[in-house]
Amino acid sequence: DNAHLVSNLHANLGGLYRMNGQAELAKEHMEKGIFLLEQYQLLYTNDSIPQINNYAALLTELQEPERAMAALQKLAQLIKEYNSDTCLDYAQVQESMGNICLITANISQAKTHFKKAMKIYENVWADEPELIEEKYQEIQELYPQVGIALARGVLASKN
């Protein structure tokens, strides 16, 4: 119980440091939080999902997308093992992996992750078509945003 609490505190501190542009402190605290979850075999719990998602986003911002993907793949495996690969948590991780693939210009892999996520959303939200449509829109809007960011990156590297 205490490990859970301390882990959440580190995750929250990491999030605050990230918001304030202190990436190294953010990374340090996020890693401490995740380490505690690992040490006490709590990685399968619901709390680990946003922690690892946020950590993966930070790693991607720090130009470490491979480490981010590795963390998310490990999380996806745990969710599949302890819950299933048809639950919303699994879909959320697939979506995060799709985002990282988009950011790193791995479009075909991004599509694969987004399709897996959408299939789960469609099944879970079968009675709520407006949620499905909202999620489709959200994912579709990522493509042009990433395209613009990639173009800026290419242009910036030419200067």
What are these regions (language model features)?
Residues D1, Q39-Y44, E81-T86, N123-E130:
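Short coil/turn linkers that connect adjacent helices within long alpha-helical scaffolds
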Residues H4, M19-L25, Q39:
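Extended non-membrane alpha-helical scaffolds
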Residues H4-M19, M30, N46-E61, L88-N99, ...:
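Conserved alpha-helical positions within TPR/SEL1-like repeat arrays
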Residues I34-Q39, Q73-E81, M118-E122:
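Amphipathic alpha-helical segments of tetratricopeptide repeats
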Residues E61, E81, S96-I103, K116-N123:
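Short basic/hydrophobic patches in alpha-helices and adjacent helix-turn junctions
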Residues K111-N159:
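C-terminal non-catalytic interaction modules
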